[in-house]
Amino acid sequence: MTIQVLFATEYDSANIVISLLCGVEVDHDLYPILYKRINYNNGASNNDGSRSGAINFDDRVNDEDSRLNAPVDDTIEFCLQTQSCEDSIRIRPVFYCHAHALNFETRYRTHEVLGSATLLQCLDESRTLTMYRRILSEIITEPSSASEKRNPAPTNLRHLVYFHRDVLVKYLTENFIMPTSPAWFISVFGSYEASLVLTMHYYLLERQYSTVQTTQHYAKCFTGDMGKPLVSCYSMKDFMIMIQSSAFLGKTAKFTHYCKLKNDRDLQELMAIDASINAFRQNVCLTEAEHVHFMYLAFGTALAKTKFLDYTLKTSLLSNNDDQTNNCNDYIVDNCAVDNHCQNDIDEIIIPRSSTNRTFAISEVSYDRSNSTSSSGVYSMDSCDESRGSEDSAMCSLYESRYLSHNLKKELLNIMELYFTPTSYLNIYVKVHKHESKSPLFEGYSIDTCSEKGTVFSGTSTSMADRLRKGNKMFEGLFEETDSEGVSSVLNIIASNRHAILPRCEDDDSCGKSTSGMPNRICKREIVFPGLTRPAPMYRTDGFNNMQICRYFSVVSKENWFSNSNLTDVLNMVPDEYVSDERLTESVWVPDVKVSSPRLSEQLYRSRHEMFNDRLPVYNFVGDVDLKVTGPVSKDWMFSFCRTLRRIILETFEHLFEKIDHGEHPVYFFKSGCEPENGSFCACSEKIGLRVITPFPRNTCILGGKTMKHLCEIINHILFLDKEMFSLVNVTVVDKNCFDYGIYSHGKSVRLPMMSKVDENLGFLQNRLLPLFIVPDSYRHGGRHKVFVRDQLNISNWLHHNASGTAYDPCKTISYVLSIDDVGRAQDVSFIDHKLNKLLKKEYVHIDTIIELFKSKYDISETRYFIEKIVWPQFLRTIKTNYHSAAGNQFNNVCFDDTSWPCVQLFKIHQGTRRNFSCIQHDHRDGRENVQFFLDFRPESATTIWTTLWSRCFSRKCKSNAKNVHVSHKLTIQQ
């Protein structure tokens, strides 16, 4: 039998121990704090060693503490706390004494301090000498001097310690914690008697993985009586007597058993929480940001304060502690001999007898919903005997139900499952607001794509502004003056249906004509663009002149599309028989053009972008898809992705709008061209660009770009929730938000199919959007696939605001979709962030609300003026301080375009015109002014906003149009 004794001194323990080992009596005493009996040869010394809360040390003969070959007679190990915790050993011996000579337990009960003379009489020099020889052999590897090599190692303990005193003092100081005041013990282990005694005993004398904080928590769960406070305990002797006389020493064996069971219970809960969270994560595709936020949300919900306190009470012994105090009132220090009566009491409280021997596998914690019959979280289990007492049944259900993980599923994961399941998401969270009308209330484009004579109005942004100014002067007084700056004003005029009535001249005999020959009713659109009686698309064309990109804007109402775009021969080469989508795509060969044309009439059919008009109804869904992939994809993968995407879009439209014939409804796909090598299908290794276009169901159109953005966000959310799509893209696609909803802002443009990008350096055409045919079932027979190919190559089917000939059924009412809302979101906050804000009790404040507070504080009415006077000066100072003068000077005279608020674009004013900037990060070879700068506004709280300055440079050195963030500033309203 061995007794481990934790002692302390009021002086430097290292020097006291070394002096004792040298045989020198010192004036300082040793204060035994705690002790424990250990039988190194008993293989059943730790009956609970197999539990995860403790370490299984059944074979202590092979343990490091038994390195001196378990003694024949009883031995006392005088130990100190180690600096490091290796293999969960927190105390190690510094010397040994003979137990029969010291009679330690009698001295402990009488609160006797141990003087140096007493210890010298009982010192076990043999075992102590063996221990320090081993220590010195590890510290001193080889003899350094010739004299050390000649002289043999001392065989006497006193000689050994004397000749290596400095080395051993340093060793003890570096490897052991040697407090000299009770204040250290009180600050670390607790300021109350129960916390200190129970925590010290379990943490220092039991080999387990729990930290001090965890053990203190267990002590609070173990007893409600924390004993007396220790603030008046100053001397080490008083501290020793307090511990030795504490009634809580009689509960250490019971507390040890409770801690191991509680530790195992906590571990099972955490494993169940992990399994539930991982099971959910493996079945949904989240972005990186959503993954991080979901982890915070899940663990914050599972371990919320109220739930954790409730769980703590359910697994504590507070209600049973007082009844069982007298059962274990003897101080039992041998953990191997825990009284069976005490152990059974704890088993009945923490784990019922019927559950004690059960093995709980992780597979029990799956993501299947648990049927709860109680709102408290303790729900019945079939394995519990109904005839058992209410307390036993509750504890049985508590242990088997995994209380915390059950509440996690109940309060979050089951709700998340509804939101991340396509059908339930569309049924519960998506609300569509429609207006039904028997007759058309709005009109879209009216274009003719087969006209031999074209109607095209083209020019630069400057010439378009001149048109507006001339129109304002020409009929001043008939219409309100239109802002002549920006292409958005041109779009507003194109969409306007407001007419003015011209006064009739009395001398005019002609019917319906004025003297000027103008009609009596005239629209402002016809003034600016003569002959344009109905809305028409406005395109942006990128040209290349004088080694730089030039942008032109064209309003086209009539053109011969197939002839001018050289697609007539393509249609003639379509095979007569349909074989497969892959074969049809390969057989339709489109002639390639690599160089920009200096003539706008030709360049219009090589580079064309449609500009979104927020004032016109939307008849076609035009999706701009950017697939961020891990590497090149195969042909089979690409076509499988398109077919699955087609099905998901049609199912979504069918649920939101009207019934759709999946075998008839067209969905057009166009993929950005690349140059594959070695016969591969695609060479895109980082990003695949797609254009997905499909008309809305008949008699359905959407009003407003905001509604289109919401629809795009819904499709983004649903897309990767589909099981077939998820298995297809889980490894291949990096980011799930592949649909760009920024193209649905007023004045934003999207590149049309069959069009190319213009290289900014040499003007070459690249990444042309080429057709990829996914033919509906009804078009696959009787040569109808030719009709589908012609429709897919017809520009009239690609435009946002152009209704097809079959868009309306006169026998049915027309549905104008006014809004499509995801009620699971809070304004601009995602579903997960909304839940996280509620968990953190963080109230979301819209940016417009905060801006109004700032404007009222500074007595400013216009947002642009607020940006110019309050926000921008901070950025200007930062730019001038951190960038070279040439870069900073171009920001001296700027203006702001808040059309896409809260993203504000900057322009510099040069000779009365708005222009972009030069790059401030690098000195590019051409140094052109084509860099766009923006200010992003984001709310942090009800009184704070963050503003970020970022830019997009088109050069490769700046990552080709990637977002480059420069600086952020914080603006706060002082309360």
UniProtKB/Swiss-Prot annotation:
Stretches annotated zinc finger (CHC2-type): 919-958
Domain of life: Viruses
Name of one Pfam family that matches: Herpes_UL52
Localization of this protein: Host nucleus
Site for Essential for primase activity, residues: 624, 626
Main location: host cell
Molecular function GO terms recorded: ATP binding; DNA-directed RNA polymerase activity; helicase activity; hydrolase activity; zinc ion binding
GO BP term (any one): DNA replication
Keywords, ordered alphabetically: ATP-binding, DNA replication, Helicase, Host nucleus, Hydrolase, Metal-binding, Nucleotide-binding, Transferase, Zinc, Zinc-finger
GO cellular component, one term: host cell nucleus
Protein EC: 2.7.7.-
Transmembrane spans: none
HAMAP family: HSV_PRIM
Subunit organization: Associates with the helicase and the primase-associated factor to form the helicase-primase factor.
Similarity comment: family membership: Belongs to the herpesviridae DNA primase family.
Function: Essential component of the helicase/primase complex. Unwinds the DNA at the replication forks and generates single-stranded DNA for both leading and lagging strand synthesis. The primase initiates primer synthesis and thereby produces large amount of short RNA primers on the lagging strand that the polymerase elongates using dNTPs.
Name assigned to this protein: DNA primase
